[in-house]
């Protein structure tokens, strides 16, 4: 952990995962007391800090704190003039480049055509004009297309790639849908995720928290398709994770959702992969990246992550 200006010859030791979590939580808890509630596009505020802290609590398996913070944040957003869930009828439009910093947005990284990194931009990677492999998995496409009433399916666009029918994800759109979306913002924290944090934490806690958590889950489910609803009998961790995959697709959560809940990662053959299904256990050593070799020049006593050679 680096919490001060490091000198030229200073070589801080490696911290534990627990120490890292403690430091992050302590920093965010302090930030919440210092930051303004005013929405300032492209910058963090108190709402954004609380949303990130709720996510950290959930990752840390502190479900009571995750639920209580998410629950209060939802209530505060509901009474604010700045934040609200995107309604069903405006959901697709909310992802257009013209709708940056929408009512759900707590924090997003601002991009413009003047500062775009070009081929290194997120939009380029996900666009048919770019690397041409930014389409969703076959499993996800089939799941969304099976429910034509779910408005989130309208973010998928049918296309052809290598002679196959594939489905592009249009959460990151260009200004005209003909060129790579280089000026799309990167959404980091939004209100829908906070609803799903409360839903997951409530499911794990049970009792009154589960009753409230189910209500928050159904806010997201019914916003997608007003005819759908999850009953208490179907309110399970897997159902919550399934809804997270639908709502947060393309936002970088699914892999970590599975790991932190001890789930097996199942990679089904389809558009991207061979026809053979592949399963990866959550504790497989490659789920954690190796420490770069150059680091050992400065810290020769540091241990490499399990499973990887040190040189």
Regions found by a protein language model. Give the residues of each.
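Short, cationic low-complexity segments
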Residues: 128-142
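Acidic/polar-rich alpha-helix caps and helix-coil junctions
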Residues: 1-124, 133, 145-311
């Amino acid at each position: 952990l680096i919490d001060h200006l490091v000198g030229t010859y200073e070589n801080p030791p490696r911290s534990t995962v627990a120490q890292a979590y403690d430091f992050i939580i302590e920093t965010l808890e302090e930030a919440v007391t210092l930051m303004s509630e005013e929405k300032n596009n492209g910058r963090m505020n108190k709402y954004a800090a609380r949303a990130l802290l709720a996510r950290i609590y959930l990752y840390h398996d502190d479900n009571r704190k995750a639920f209580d913070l998410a629950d209060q944040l939802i209530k505060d957003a509901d009474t604010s003039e700045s934040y609200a869930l995107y309604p069903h009828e405006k959901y697709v439009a909310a992802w257009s480049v013209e709708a940056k910093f929408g009512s759900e947005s707590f924090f997003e990284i601002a991009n413009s055509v003047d500062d775009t990194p070009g081929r290194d931009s997120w939009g380029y990677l996900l666009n048919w004009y770019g690397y041409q492999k930014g389409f969703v998995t076959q499993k996800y496409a089939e799941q969304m297309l099976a429910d034509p009433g779910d408005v989130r399916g309208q973010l998928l666009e049918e296309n052809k790639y290598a002679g196959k029918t594939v489905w592009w994800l249009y959460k990151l759109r260009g200004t005209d849908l003909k060129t790579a979306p280089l000026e799309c913002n990167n959404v980091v924290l939004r209100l829908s995720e906070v609803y799903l944090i409360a839903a997951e934490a409530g499911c794990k806690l049970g009792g009154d928290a589960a009753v409230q958590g189910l209500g928050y889950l159904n806010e997201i489910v019914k916003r997608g398709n007003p005819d759908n609803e999850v009953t208490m009998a179907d309110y399970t961790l897997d159902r919550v994770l399934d809804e997270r995959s639908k709502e947060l697709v393309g936002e970088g959560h699914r892999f970590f959702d599975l790991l932190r809940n001890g789930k097996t990662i199942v990679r089904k053959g389809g558009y991207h992969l061979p026809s053979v299904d592949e399963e990866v256990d959550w504790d497989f050593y490659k789920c954690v990246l190796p420490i770069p070799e150059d680091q050992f020049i400065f810290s020769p006593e540091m241990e490499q992550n399990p499973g990887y050679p040190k040189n």
